[in-house]
Every structure is written in structure tokens, then in C-alpha cells.
Amino acid sequence: EMCIRDSGFNDNRRYGLKEAVHIIDGLKSQGFSVMLGVPTQWRALEGDTESDPRLHELIRKCDIMMPWFVGRYNETTYPKYQKLVEEDIQWAKKNQVDYAPLVFPGFSWGNLKGKDHNSFIPRNKGSFLWTQLTGAIRAGAEMIYVAMFDEIDEGTAIFKCAQKVPVGKSTFVPIEEGVESDHYLKLVGEAAKILRKEKAIAYNTKLNPAG
């Protein structure tokens, strides 16, 4: 499987739908399945999306689609996007494309751009991520794209993180107090069990649902 990221955005990127079609057609001709990353508002062709209906044709060429949600909402504003996911899934099923909604644990520009550009979405000790995971599953998702395993630049990493900074003064931010170093990996693992029908979905956002 190959993933082609960020097609259809309206921010004047150096590539467009024409280039994406060429790449996807080439991959499909060689037997690859293709996942296409698209903007949040891909279905309505508004907001972060260019108003070109050819994007929908491009999506139909692919096996899986994944809308980019990082930075679009926080735990308070998420419910509107859960409804968006539900409607996206209906479109995807009608058009015979698999749909992988994106979830992310939190966000910060602090590492990449410095404190002066520190747009921040709190993790809330995993509550934000768990709300998205269970929300996507309730909306009908059969697969989920987690952003990201090791993305430090935008503060979305879910990998194990120390609870104490092992050096002197540093911009490194340790994992939140009161959670284990692999807390976010556990949350994702629990969601995977639910997707595989190995356990029922938990109707709450308590920490460490495995506990």
C-alpha cells in the first residue's frame, strides 16, 4: 500500500490534482493499493479545499481516503467533526472507497516554530485522543489513521515519553503527570481491540481504559 498525502488543498502547493492523477494511475497500474490524504472539507469543496470537483474523481480512483484533521479542533469543539466523519463515511460507502478518519493526541507549534508561534491544543492526559478514537468508531469507522507515532515538530507524537527531563534546562516537555510513559500507545491499542471486535467500546473518556 502507498499513501499519497495532501491532495486538493487550496494553499497554492507546487503540485495539484493533475500530478496526483499521474502518480496514482501509475501506482495502481503496478498493483499497489493507494490511500489518499485530503483536506478536512473535501466533501463540500470549501474551507481548506480547492473548489474543483475533480478531487472527488481522484478520490474514487483510490482504495482508501484519509482527511487531514490535525489542528482543526480541540476536545470541546470535536463533536461537530464527529458528525462530519459520520457523513464522510456515508459518502465513502456510496462511492466504494474505504475511509480512515484521522485522530491526533494534541498539537503545538512550540518545537518547530518556537514559543512565539505556540498554537496549542491540550492533550488532557489522553482524554482528547480517546474522545476522537471512540467518536470515530461510533461514527462507523472501520479503520483509523493516528497522527503521528513520532511527530515531535507539531507535538503529535504518541511514542513513549519520559516523565522526567534527563538533562538540564531544556525545551523538552515531559509526559503529563499521573500517566504512564506508554499511555498514548495503550489508548491506541485499546481502540484497535475495539475495531477488531475483541472488546466492546467504552462509553467514557476516563484515563487508561484498559485498567
Stretch-by-stretch model annotation:
Residues 1, 5-211:
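Glycan-processing catalytic domains of CAZymes
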